Each structure stands twice: as C-alpha cells, then as structure tokens.
Amino acid sequence: MPGTMIFIDTDGHRDERTLKAAPKLEELQKMVGGYIQLVPLFSRVAHSSGMQKCVVLCNEDGKNLNMPLNREATRLWQLSAGKAPIQDVLVGPIVILFGDPSFMEAL
C-alpha cells in the first residue's frame, strides 16, 4: 500500500515523504494546525511520476484563524481545477496525498 504525502507550508516549502500506510487523523491535524477539511476541486496533481489523482487537506478553520495565504497551494489548486474557476484561496499549510488504490481507499 505505497503512497506519497506532500506537505506545502505557507512559505512554499515542500516536504515529500513516501508512506507505507495512510497517515493517522491526528498526524494530519497536526500538520495543518487543526481540524482537517477536504479541498474541493483539488483532485489531481502533477508529480515526477506523472499526473496523480489525489486528496488534499487544509485546516477547516484556517481563514477564521487568519492563517497566512498559501500561494503555492492556491496555484496548484487552480491548475487542478482546470476550466472550473476558483474564486478562493488556500491558507495555512496543506497536505497532498496520493498512492495506489489501497492507499487511497484507506484515506
């Protein structure tokens, strides 16, 4: 069940890890700084291994907490949405997850 997790901080710094199993909820919450929310229309991401179907998570209360804008994550979100216009921005750190079918199902 191999998978990949990419963490993108608000300064654009990326940390990519290969995972043997889906991360635990508590780990994801710690990474985004609170309760997680699925980012709508962010379902694919370009990776060195090609375009990948993905799940992207952010802090569900990030805007109310005045978390800083995440320009890189917002740019990737707009690319993922294709022709669907995104009239919003992502704030705070985000987590991108993708992998084989069993990894994705475990999320």
What are the residue ranges of the model-derived segments?
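Domain-length accessory/inserted modules outside core catalytic folds
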Residues: 1-107
